[in-house]
Protein backbone atom coordinates (compact mmCIF):
# COMPACT_ATOMS: atom_id res chain seq x y z
CA UNK A 1 0.00 0.00 0.00
CA UNK A 2 2.79 2.43 0.86
CA UNK A 3 4.56 1.64 -2.40
CA UNK A 4 1.37 2.26 -4.38
CA UNK A 5 0.90 5.62 -2.60
CA UNK A 6 4.53 6.48 -3.33
CA UNK A 7 4.15 5.66 -7.03
CA UNK A 8 0.96 7.71 -7.27
CA UNK A 9 2.62 10.66 -5.52
CA UNK A 10 5.62 10.34 -7.86
CA UNK A 11 3.33 10.41 -10.90
CA UNK A 12 1.47 13.49 -9.61
CA UNK A 13 4.78 15.22 -8.92
CA UNK A 14 6.04 14.30 -12.40
CA UNK A 15 2.88 15.58 -14.11
CA UNK A 16 3.10 18.88 -12.19
CA UNK A 17 6.73 19.30 -13.26
CA UNK A 18 5.77 18.47 -16.84
CA UNK A 19 3.02 21.11 -16.75
CA UNK A 20 5.50 23.72 -15.49
CA UNK A 21 7.88 22.78 -18.32
CA UNK A 22 5.12 23.20 -20.92
CA UNK A 23 4.52 26.75 -19.71
CA UNK A 24 8.00 27.73 -20.85
CA UNK A 25 7.99 29.45 -24.23
CA UNK A 26 11.67 29.24 -25.13
CA UNK A 27 12.54 25.94 -26.87
CA UNK A 28 15.99 25.71 -25.27
CA UNK A 29 14.48 26.20 -21.82
CA UNK A 30 11.97 23.44 -22.55
CA UNK A 31 14.72 21.10 -23.76
CA UNK A 32 16.78 21.71 -20.64
CA UNK A 33 13.78 21.11 -18.39
CA UNK A 34 12.98 17.90 -20.29
CA UNK A 35 16.55 16.69 -19.70
CA UNK A 36 16.12 17.38 -16.00
CA UNK A 37 12.82 15.46 -15.92
CA UNK A 38 14.42 12.45 -17.62
CA UNK A 39 17.24 12.40 -15.09
CA UNK A 40 14.98 12.95 -12.10
CA UNK A 41 12.08 10.61 -12.89
CA UNK A 42 13.06 8.06 -15.53
CA UNK A 43 16.80 7.65 -15.84
CA UNK A 44 19.81 9.08 -17.63
CA UNK A 45 18.91 11.37 -20.51
CA UNK A 46 22.13 10.33 -22.24
CA UNK A 47 20.74 6.79 -22.54
CA UNK A 48 17.03 7.36 -23.17
CA UNK A 49 17.51 10.15 -25.71
CA UNK A 50 19.36 7.84 -28.12
CA UNK A 51 18.02 4.41 -27.12
CA UNK A 52 15.96 2.35 -29.54
CA UNK A 53 12.57 1.14 -28.37
CA UNK A 54 14.12 -2.32 -27.94
CA UNK A 55 16.81 -0.87 -25.64
CA UNK A 56 14.15 0.99 -23.67
CA UNK A 57 12.05 -2.15 -23.24
CA UNK A 58 15.11 -4.11 -22.07
CA UNK A 59 15.94 -1.40 -19.54
CA UNK A 60 12.36 -1.31 -18.29
CA UNK A 61 12.25 -5.12 -18.02
CA UNK A 62 14.87 -4.76 -15.28
CA UNK A 63 12.28 -3.14 -12.99
CA UNK A 64 10.73 -6.04 -11.08
CA UNK A 65 7.65 -4.26 -9.73
CA UNK A 66 5.13 -4.14 -12.59
CA UNK A 67 3.26 -1.08 -11.33
CA UNK A 68 6.49 0.89 -11.00
CA UNK A 69 7.65 -0.30 -14.44
CA UNK A 70 4.38 0.75 -16.11
CA UNK A 71 4.49 4.12 -14.34
CA UNK A 72 8.04 4.77 -15.54
CA UNK A 73 7.08 3.71 -19.06
CA UNK A 74 4.13 6.10 -19.01
CA UNK A 75 6.35 8.95 -17.76
CA UNK A 76 8.94 8.19 -20.44
CA UNK A 77 6.24 8.15 -23.12
CA UNK A 78 5.07 11.57 -21.92
CA UNK A 79 8.63 12.89 -22.11
CA UNK A 80 9.14 11.51 -25.63
CA UNK A 81 5.77 12.93 -26.69
CA UNK A 82 6.56 16.41 -25.36
CA UNK A 83 10.18 16.42 -26.48
CA UNK A 84 9.04 15.74 -30.05
CA UNK A 85 7.67 19.30 -30.19
CA UNK A 86 11.15 20.72 -29.56
CA UNK A 87 13.09 18.92 -32.31
CA UNK A 88 13.04 18.65 -36.08
CA UNK A 89 12.68 15.74 -38.46
CA UNK A 90 13.52 12.83 -38.44
CA UNK A 91 14.06 12.93 -34.66
CA UNK A 92 10.49 14.13 -34.12
CA UNK A 93 9.00 11.04 -35.76
CA UNK A 94 11.41 8.74 -33.91
CA UNK A 95 10.37 10.24 -30.56
CA UNK A 96 6.69 10.05 -31.44
CA UNK A 97 7.12 6.43 -32.51
CA UNK A 98 8.78 5.56 -29.20
CA UNK A 99 6.07 7.43 -27.30
CA UNK A 100 3.36 5.54 -29.18
CA UNK A 101 4.98 2.16 -28.52
CA UNK A 102 5.27 2.91 -24.80
CA UNK A 103 1.73 4.29 -24.55
CA UNK A 104 0.50 1.18 -26.38
CA UNK A 105 2.36 -1.13 -23.99
CA UNK A 106 1.00 0.67 -20.93
CA UNK A 107 -2.49 0.60 -22.44
CA UNK A 108 -2.28 -3.16 -23.04
CA UNK A 109 -0.66 -4.17 -19.74
CA UNK A 110 -1.85 -1.54 -17.29
CA UNK A 111 -5.09 -1.55 -15.36
CA UNK A 112 -5.68 2.20 -15.51
CA UNK A 113 -7.90 3.56 -18.27
CA UNK A 114 -6.75 6.91 -19.64
CA UNK A 115 -8.69 8.81 -22.27
CA UNK A 116 -5.81 11.29 -22.39
CA UNK A 117 -3.39 8.48 -23.30
CA UNK A 118 -5.74 7.21 -26.01
CA UNK A 119 -6.12 10.72 -27.42
CA UNK A 120 -2.35 11.14 -27.56
CA UNK A 121 -2.02 7.79 -29.33
CA UNK A 122 -4.63 8.87 -31.90
CA UNK A 123 -2.82 12.18 -32.38
CA UNK A 124 0.50 10.39 -32.92
CA UNK A 125 -1.14 8.11 -35.51
CA UNK A 126 -2.38 11.20 -37.34
CA UNK A 127 1.03 12.87 -37.25
CA UNK A 128 3.20 9.99 -38.36
CA UNK A 129 0.72 7.43 -39.67
CA UNK A 130 2.53 4.76 -41.68
CA UNK A 131 5.87 5.57 -40.04
CA UNK A 132 4.70 3.69 -36.91
CA UNK A 133 6.76 0.55 -36.51
Give each language-model segment a name.
Residues 1-73, 105, 127-133:
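N-terminal alpha-helical interaction modules that lie
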Residues 89-133:
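Amphipathic alpha-helical binding modules
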Residues 17, 77-80, 102-103, 124:
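Non-transmembrane amphipathic alpha-helical segments
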Residues 68-92:
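Mid-chain, well-packed structural core segment of small domains
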Residues 22-33, 83-95:
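Short coil/turn connectors between adjacent alpha-helices in alpha-solenoid helical repeat scaffolds
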Amino acid sequence: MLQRDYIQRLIREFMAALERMLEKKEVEERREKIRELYNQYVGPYAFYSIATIEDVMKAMAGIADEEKRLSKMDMLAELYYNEADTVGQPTRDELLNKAFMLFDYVEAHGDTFSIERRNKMAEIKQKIGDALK
